[in-house]
């Protein structure tokens, strides 16, 4: 528990109405998580306004409400919290419920500062590693954690696939959770004696101030591509780039991909010590002599790491140059933990990342991969990489998420038409959009390759399970099939409901023989 009066010293506020001499039992920003004595912070989300949930928070036992002062209006009966659908009298909350109401200019900023203070600033009590980039955050986080664990460090993780507090693994809704959840997790890591935390830091997480009160000992920049632009994400690429660059002003050591064309913009105004990694340019850590090997149902990447005067041969089960970049970032981080070269090589050789180039096809004679590639850059990198293994045919199955960038659909369709031998267009997470419309927009991209002299070969199968079964039914020796877009996800989101659907499960069932006969 923390005393409210002490917590309020951590923020700038406009007013405090009610008794601030009270103990707080918890802090949260979702009304369903409120319990007796909680401090509830009202934040605005993409779809919901947290101020609308004040009545629910009060019913669940909230002791303190932190609200945006724009929603507090003076009336004849006193100040009221007013939204389009809700009106609550502040004095009645104080009189009838003994609730304290705090008004601030920015509730997200307040949530971050209050959360850090409530959990006693756990980020200051272990090494913090933050990883950002359009693609590769999850793989780099797993590679980094794997290397550090191989060296005997106790490592916590926060990222797209899961959080790990040193003892328990949990799935998370967002790549970078809300700040109250981040600091709760960090606090558990400290309790479980973690030496460090590896965290994926999304641009949205930075923009929404979820990491505002964390100073990272090491910040890693992987890459940036024109993605995540649109309603509910970033308004422009410049805004997206700026959000990514903020990590370099929030860390002690910045490790950057020297080959990314926007690296100088990422470093603009940086306050950190800078190190770099590269395949194409002289850098602190480099990779060269890369080559790829396809066995019976397996793919391997081989390369040489060059660091100062040292050279080491490395083998990974993760295919492709983009994964070599991810490995270089992880190796660069490991250098600050004095990890032995053999430990680095051993960790990289065995690391598997759920839903990231995950090979499902041992012994099948062909390779069936599941990958999270869900934008043009990641799909292009993936398909170009798989081409280097010289498969008999390269078959790709993918869709695009609804309520996300529309341009992404054409771009991914064009990329698939240009790089794959056969494409199966299917449904991803349509969310609130018509899946058929999304598939048609992907098809437009495939057809667009005709202008470049390519005649794309493809089929549309809306049912994702049926699309996988169709791919397995047509698979031949030395084919590579890749199911892209959802990776580790265990659901399909349709009109606000998440239905159970796990690519790994449906692929395994298809490979085990549950394939229907198709006539197309």
For each predicted feature, which ranges?
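Short, active-site-adjacent cap segments at secondary-structure transitions
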Residues: 72-74, 162-165, 205-207, 261-265, ...
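Phosphate-binding loop of NTP-binding sites
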Residues: 103, 108-258, 262-273, 328, ...
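N-terminal leader/targeting and accessory segments in enzymes
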Residues: 1-111, 291, 297, 315, ...
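Acidic, Mg2+-coordinating active-site environments of NTP-dependent enzymes
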Residues: 10, 73-74, 82, 91-96, ...
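Short loop/edge segments at beta-strand edges and connector loops
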Residues: 18, 67-68, 105, 159, ...
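ATP-dependent carboxylate-amine ligase
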Residues: 1-15, 33-39, 49-52, 62, ...
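Short, glycine/acidic-enriched loop or turn micro-motifs at the edges of active sites
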Residues: 71, 203, 226, 260, ...
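Short secondary-structure boundary segments
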Residues: 67-70, 201, 223, 258, ...
């Amino acid at each position: 528990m923390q005393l409210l009066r002490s917590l309020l010293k951590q923020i700038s506020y406009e007013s405090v109405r009610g008794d601030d001499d009270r103990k707080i039992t918890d802090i949260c920003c979702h009304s369903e998580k409120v319990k007796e004595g909680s401090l509830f912070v009202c934040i605005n989300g993409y779809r919901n306004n947290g101020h609308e949930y004040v009545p629910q928070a009060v019913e669940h036992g909230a002791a303190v409400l932190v609200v945006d002062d724009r929603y507090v209006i003076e009336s004849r009966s006193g100040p009221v919290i007013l939204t389009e659908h809700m009106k609550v009298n502040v004095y009645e909350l104080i009189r009838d419920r003994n609730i304290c109401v705090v008004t601030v200019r920015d509730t997200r900023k307040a949530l971050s500062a209050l959360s850090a203070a409530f959990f006693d600033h756990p980020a200051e009590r272990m090494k913090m590693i933050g990883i950002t980039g359009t693609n590769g955050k999850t793989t780099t986080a797993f590679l980094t954690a794997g290397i550090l664990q191989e060296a005997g460090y106790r490592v916590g993780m926060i990222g797209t696939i899961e959080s790990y507090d040193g003892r328990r693994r949990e799935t998370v809704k967002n790549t970078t959770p809300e700040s109250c959840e981040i600091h709760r997790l960090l606090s558990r890591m400290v309790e479980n004696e973690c030496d460090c935390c590896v965290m994926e830091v999304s641009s949205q997480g930075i923009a929404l101030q979820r990491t505002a009160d964390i100073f990272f000992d090491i910040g890693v920049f992987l890459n940036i591509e024109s993605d995540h632009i649109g309603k509910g994400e970033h308004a422009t690429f410049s805004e997206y780039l700026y959000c990514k660059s903020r990590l370099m002003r929030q860390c002690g050591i910045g490790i950057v991909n020297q080959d990314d064309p926007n690296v100088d913009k990422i470093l603009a105004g940086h306050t950190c010590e800078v190190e770099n990694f590269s395949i194409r340019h002289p850098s602190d850590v480099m990779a060269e002599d890369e080559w790829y090997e396809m066995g019976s149902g397996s793919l391997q990447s081989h390369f040489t790491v060059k660091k100062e005067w040292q050279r080491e041969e490395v083998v990974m089960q993760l295919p492709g140059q983009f994964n070599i970049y991810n490995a270089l970032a992880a190796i660069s981080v490991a250098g600050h933990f004095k990890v032995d070269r053999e430990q680095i090589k051993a960790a990289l050789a065995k690391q598997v990342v759920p839903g990231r180039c995950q090979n499902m096809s041992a012994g099948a004679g062909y390779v069936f991969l599941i990958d999270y590639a869900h934008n043009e850059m990641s799909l292009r990198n993936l398909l170009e990489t798989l081409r280097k293994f010289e498969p008999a045919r390269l078959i790709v199955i993918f869709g695009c998420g609804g309520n996300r960038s529309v341009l992404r659909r054409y771009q991914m369709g064009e990329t698939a038409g240009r790089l794959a031998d056969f494409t199966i267009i299917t449904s991803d997470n349509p969310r609130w959009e018509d899946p058929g419309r999304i598939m048609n927009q992907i098809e437009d991209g495939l057809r667009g390759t005709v202008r470049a002299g390519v005649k794309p070969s493809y089929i549309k199968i809306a049912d994702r399970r049926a699309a996988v079964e169709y791919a397995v039914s047509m698979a031949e020796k030395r084919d590579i099939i890749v199911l892209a877009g959802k990776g580790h996800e265990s659901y399909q989101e349709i009109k606000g409901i998440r239905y159970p659907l796990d690519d790994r499960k449906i692929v395994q069932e298809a490979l085990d023989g549950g394939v229907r006969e198709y006539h197309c």
